[in-house]
Amino acid sequence: PSPPRSTETIVVTGTYEPVPLGESDRSITVVPAEKEYQILFNDPTGFLRLDPSVDLQARGPNNIQTDVSIRGAHYGQTLVLWNGLRLNDTQTGHHNLDTPIPIESLERVEILKGAGSTLYGSDASGGVVNFISKPPETSEVHLRTSVGNFGINQQHFQLLLARKGWTEDLTADRDFSSGFRFDRDHRSLSAASLSHHTGRLGTTDVMLAASDRAYGADQFYGNYPSWERAKSWFAAIRQTFGSSMETNFSYRRHTDLFVLYRDRPELFTNRHVLETYQGAARRRLSLGQNTTFHYGTDASYDAIRSSNLGIHTRGRAAAFGAIDFRALGRFALNLGAREEVYRGLRHQFSPSVTGSVWISPKLKLRGGVSHAFRLPSFTELYYHDAANTGSPDLKPEQAWSYEAAAEWRPADRFQVQTTLFQRREHNNIDYVRQSPDETWRATNFRRLRVTGVETGLRRSLRGNRELTLSYTGLRLRTDPEPGLLSKYASNYPVHSGAVHFQGMVGGVLLLRTRFGVLQRNGGDPYLLCELGVARAYGSLRPFVQFSNLTNTGYQEVPGVAMPGRTITAGIEIRIRFN
């Protein structure tokens, strides 16, 4: 049987080649980031909140400092990509979302839920977040400015150039706030250049980006009035050779200046400088009408110089291969494996088996088993201060993920899906202690098991409007030594649900609203409401955004308060010149 055919979204995350979303044999959420609706979001992480399986643990607004978790995994077990290139930070997973990605350049965000180490290597235990940009199709200039309570002052600039054979996307962003309370101010600057060229060999993409964030960090990592400044630089080039081969190389530099007492930096100050080099080559070989073999290799090198961690390096190299059997509208089966070698010829083997089958034109079943791993960060290995201590003998985390799902599409504009999953971890890394008076120490847990369910309904309405309802429930079991207190593993959402609507109303206004309810382990449920309204047409587009509309008091990281009701209003100017 053949499934219904409509305009299908193409996905590139969790798969070795682009496939229609309806044909994917993995659990993937695609969050559109159309240019029209970007005016109703402040930063790229806002799109992640539309999937309740993604838990953002923010220490401030507008992605000043945010941890990301998928399916109950901790902050270091989610891999962050930009156009398929790794952005994860080997100093600490707290910086994985410290990215210079401009929201103006996004086309969509793809979220792979479940293990992804067979394709991507270390860190993809809980899942993968891939921010995807798109070359511009027209030449335009966009200017946006806005102000709000808590001293919010924001500006965005974008220049788009589209010519035959090449395009350019230049952006610059500024975000200031005096803070909603003492020592919670922030200043953020970023700029990026995305160049795209089409030639005889194939396509060439050059990505250049930088960001500078300085922010008050009161209570971020303990009962201290701290301050932090993080800078990030990223450069990458990607070259395709027809449709069968791709190569890429990237460089990332990240600096972190941390002051424990903001007004007394001489007491305790850390300076970290991390540099990462990465390269990869992938090739596709057709073995028949429905069979494709994918293979490739990648390597990376990390070097850190730190006043606290010392000087350390880490090199990795990997080879992978996968055979894909796929008949569109009937079935898919993928068998993959990856061998990764690191530090002293130690190695990790990560196999996976995934598949799907159409039972009827409206019903698809899919499932899979996959292995993932994560190498300890430099902070987990070597950090030390009065409150936290690393352990140089930590072992890599291991995880096996299992899932089964059903997708029902009774009509082109209506979809329901439910997924059952379990992740069994071994040597999970967390900070533990026996009493509040002791220091947190990085330790391997023997076993940890996460079991959960995801269910969602998506309904496309007339007038380019869409309504989604989604829920994720989790249960976590672990066996630490009796009497040990956990710092991160226990901070997961037991229940998380969301209702999201966006579309045009009255023919002239864009409306976006989200109602989310979340209950963390051991805590009470709380409600967060977001609302955004903007003019849909014209060169001048006023807008207003409301965050935490109900003025809920809540914490996503224990001990770190989040802002109350926030109102931001502004105007965007669009000028097209071709």
Residue ranges and their predicted role:
Residues 8-44, 67, 75:
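N-terminal periplasmic "start-of-domain" segments of outer-membrane beta-barrel proteins
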Residues 45, 49-85, 89, 107:
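Extracytoplasmic beta-strand/coil segments of soluble accessory domains associated
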Residues 86-113, 131-134:
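Short acidic/polar hinge/loop motifs at secondary-structure boundaries
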Residues 116, 128, 133-161, 171-172, ...:
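Short strand-turn segments of transmembrane beta-barrel domains in outer membranes
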Residues 177-190, 197, 201-276, 388:
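Flexible loop and strand-edge segments within Gram-negative outer membrane beta-barrel domains
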Residues 196-199, 488-578:
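Conserved C-terminal beta-signal and adjacent last beta-strands/turns
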Residues 221-242, 272-274, 358, 371-426, ...:
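Outer-membrane beta-barrel signature, preferentially recognizing the C-terminal barrel domain
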Residues 289, 294, 328, 422-424, ...:
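Gram-negative outer-membrane beta-barrel transporters
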